[in-house]
């Protein structure tokens, strides 16, 4: 199991960082952020969007600042906000252009810089090797270029975010540390050292990735490193380029929710493709669902768990329900079996009643009461899916701890464990870490939750355990079987455990976006969603972060200039300046050339 961060007490202790008229840090509420999607030079449009964000609960808002035109626009935006009594702090997002950062600090409350491209050039996979002398010189250059911004922010009382993106580490960092968590951490620490040496402490850190597993590991590692140095700076949490809709919400919740549940995080942003106002309800639900962990009287410190024998990567024993993959089961109640017509029930389980073919998101099996084993409908289900009887394995939970390690329990092929909270489940696995008996994690929907709130709750409870390698199988006990399949497989995929559908990496859009990102993303999704699981397709609005943040993708569609698209295979641009009206067909052609395309059935 990966090391978790949680220490005694709940929130990681931090300094208070002043951002405009509010504070970020452990002594204050966790702040919700978003970013405008309008062109920053569209002053009126940007002000309207900022006002709309504030109205729905956003507490800090960021705008993109590509150059000096946007710097001038920020002055006007801030003036308009003051005139309209809109007090939300304004943040400038900077990439590649240090001078813009220095100038815009006059007009905004906070500046975000990316260590991967503020001074050094982004890694272009050139294979360049830095000698120790060259590396030292590059650090001196970093100080020369970065220290003026630090000095100005200190003088004006501005805040700063040192925001590392996994996909845009600098060439120098990549050469020394590789594409690693360590590289992400030291990319941030190099800039932090300049701030500390200049006695400037109004800083916040982020360690974003489109992969929740990478993101969680990076934040945990950074928090430990900062605390060892007694640099108690706040953390801004986010899964970058999470995508859209339910899948994007789940991916964000797996990453952000895991960290919030262990006391990490002082401000959050859910990067969802579409209108930024859609991000705020997700953030509010995340904070609501993770707040219960701070109130728990049974906190468990997962720092004590360094390894679990229930690793998701191991091959499961032959007698376990599902071999060689992390299994997904659904529970069928008597009500399901007695009131739903057999063909309808099979369709709800993803079985084509005409061909008998199972959908990629059909469960690996169903769990039913033993009293129903002789019914005709069970015989019909058994033709298509494996059946397990609820009473054949112990059902463990917080209320029967005396059974967890009993001889009778340990003699069974596997056990179910009902997960009510992350703490309780981690404690269960810690006590059993010397036993190889497989565990099926069992989940039920909590009462009175909306569909979105239920998805967020399950993403946190299951996602945190998946990221730490716990369990061998999951069982969802829902009345809505289609919802169980949708949520179950999406969470497994978001945690990089099991891929069943195409994964889409798409940015939320910002003032740099060169096309209608939600519309194009949806069109590409509709044309490719039938392709096999495991494939990753990125749709990115511009070339500033696009090529880096889609480094995990197999294929990429990236805005290069107005009306033009660059197409990527892995991190290599293979077609440049493709007219937008042809770009989707060209993407399909690339998929065909690389042998991953198939015609829809």
From Swiss-Prot:
Signal peptide range: none
Cofactor-binding details, from the entry: Binds 1 [4Fe-4S] cluster.
Domain of life: Bacteria
Gene Ontology molecular functions: 4 iron, 4 sulfur cluster binding; 4-hydroxy-3-methylbut-2-en-1-yl diphosphate synthase activity (ferredoxin); 4-hydroxy-3-methylbut-2-enyl-diphosphate synthase activity (flavodoxin); iron ion binding
Family as reported in the entry's similarity comment: Belongs to the IspG family.
NCBIfam families: ispG_gcpE (TIGR00612), PRK00694.1 (NF001912)
Name of the protein in question: 4-hydroxy-3-methylbut-2-en-1-yl diphosphate synthase (flavodoxin)
Species for this entry: Chlamydia muridarum (strain MoPn / Nigg)
